[in-house]
Amino acid sequence: THPRAFGNFARLLGKYVRDEKVITLENAIYKLTGLPASNLKLKKRGYLKKGFYADIVVFNPKTINDFATFENPMQYATGVNHVLVNGTHVIDNGNHTGAYGGRFVKGPGYKN
């Protein structure tokens, strides 16, 4: 397993936004949300808008960190407080609720 499988977003937000200031928080969030949704033509995703699916991550920019390494890749990131997938609360105060709100999302290139 590659370490970024466990801490890719946290690495961007912790190391490159907060610590090294290589990218702004606003630009990083756009690159993690709106940009890929737009590029993949995913309807009603990637933005906080009325009528869009409620895919929301609440994190603390001061504490978000990744810990995964090549030697020990299966280390969860910290600083993510809440996650809602399609409006379903799946992470509550950093703990999985047991709920699964995800579903298969078809992009424009999907063929049966």
Task: Indicate where each model-derived feature is located.
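Short C-terminal domain-edge/linker segments immediately following a structured domain
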Residues: K21-E26, N86-N93, N112
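Short, solvent-exposed cationic patches
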Residues: V105-N112
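C-terminal cap of metal-dependent C-N hydrolases
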Residues: V58-R103
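His/Asp/Glu-enriched, well-ordered alpha-helical/loop segment
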Residues: T1-T63
